[in-house]
Amino acid sequence: MRPGDIFLAKLARKPAPRCGIGSATSVVTTDLMDAVQVAFPHAHLDAESMARLAAAGHTVLGFDNVMPLFSVWHESAAMGCEVDWGGKNQWPNGQPMYSSVDDAILVPPDLLKRPGCAVPLKALGLLQQMMNGQVAVVGKVFGPWTLGYHVFGIEAFLMASLLEPDAVKRAMRKLIEVTVAFANAQIDCGAEAITLADHCTRDLCSPETYRDFLLEIHQELQQRIRCPVILHICGNTADRLQYIRETGLACFHFDSKVSAAEARRLAGEKLALMGGTSNFDIVRNGTLESIEKDIVEKLNVGIDIVGPECAVPLDAPYKNLRTLVDVAKKLSGDPPATDQISKPHET
């Protein structure tokens, strides 16, 4: 099977000759930018640069998928948020555009033609050509809870969820249309799966809030997005996995704050699991021994797609990601062609 076929099979919890190896979020590091001579912020703003940098997820790192939307701000920028696109060592950041959840949300009729959306849409098409069907091309959108943070500001949005819950729900009904439109446009441009990132982690959203505000929203997104959907939520999500498994979404990309064994138990048999490898302990500071131990743990409990827990830190050495890929292939029955595992970065 081609790497992309393995990735998509594992999203559906179907048999494959080895585990999937990939990430629903960014795997870009500063030394990976150096390796392919493409850097932020240009790779956020130019489709060809974005596609070249995303392709390195396979051509340099060896992952089974590529994902070109490195930032969290693309659709929010297209909505009208002012965004500082950062630099090589700095992630983008943006400013809210409304002062109250009661403000009327205006979705621009040309949303998908604005650079925030148009650039990654073009990059997805370029990636499909570059990868030639060998690996899975994955898109990424943000759910209406996170878009609420962006357009209203985190503090204002969270306070409103307590004091004006009906207004928040009305706002989310409007913002869900942005998520759906951008997701399905990405599919039309070549995405074979979509990451749905929604920052409803424990410190910002209680499990009851997830149940009351987000469960139905995520169920609806599963129905309206026309491909397998990978939900990504940072942090310890053990207290809401019982609800996440009710969404019908294909896969959950989980944080190392939930142990792999607990995540597998709580997810049940239908929900595929991806990730769970610590960015700090393994991706940034791992040794061959610690990487092997981590992958063995994931494989023993049935994690479908191994890889980083979240967007990789920019200062992590990409060689550790390459080592993770080689170890995962060797331990799950598909050793590297040279039978030589890449050595992790030595500090």
Question: PLM ranges: what are they?
Answer:
Residues 51-55, 63, 117-124:
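Generic internal hydrophobic packing segments that stabilize the cores of diverse globular domains
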Residues 29-61:
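Active-site-flanking structural segment that lines cofactor/substrate pockets
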Residues 71-110, 134:
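A contiguous, low-structure linker/loop signature
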Residues 33, 77-80, 127:
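Pocket-flanking alpha-helical
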Residues 1-31, 109-347:
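Active-site loop segments of alpha/beta catalytic cores
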Residues 45-48, 97-102, 114, 166, ...:
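Intrinsic-disorder/low-complexity, polar/charged segments
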Residues 53-81:
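Glycine-rich, N-terminal phosphate-binding loop and its surrounding beta-alpha-beta segment
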